[in-house]
């Protein structure tokens, strides 16, 4: 399952809505990337959503 290991973001469910307003079920999946992150000086491979990845880059730039 596509799930972020940092924030726990999971797929959400909703509808595709056609022009005639028919609704069919669909799944909104988070954009999860496999990235090597350095936590406490130890590199670790994690599946992280791009929102968390962006935040990590931002925090690293400010530090």
Curated annotation (Swiss-Prot):
Keywords: Ribonucleoprotein, Ribosomal protein. One of its GO terms (molecular function) is structural constituent of ribosome. GO terms for cellular component: ribonucleoprotein complex; ribosome. Coiled coil: none annotated. GO terms for biological process: translation. Belongs to the bacterial ribosomal protein bL28 family. This is Large ribosomal subunit protein bL28.
């Amino acid at each position: 399952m596509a799930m972020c290991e940092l924030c726990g973001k999971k797929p959400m469910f909703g509808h595709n809505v056609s022009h005639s307003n028919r609704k069919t079920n669909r799944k909104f999946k988070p954009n999860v990337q496999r990235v090597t992150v350095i936590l406490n000086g130890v590199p670790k491979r994690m599946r992280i959503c791009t929102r968390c990845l962006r935040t990590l880059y931002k925090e690293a730039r400010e530090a």
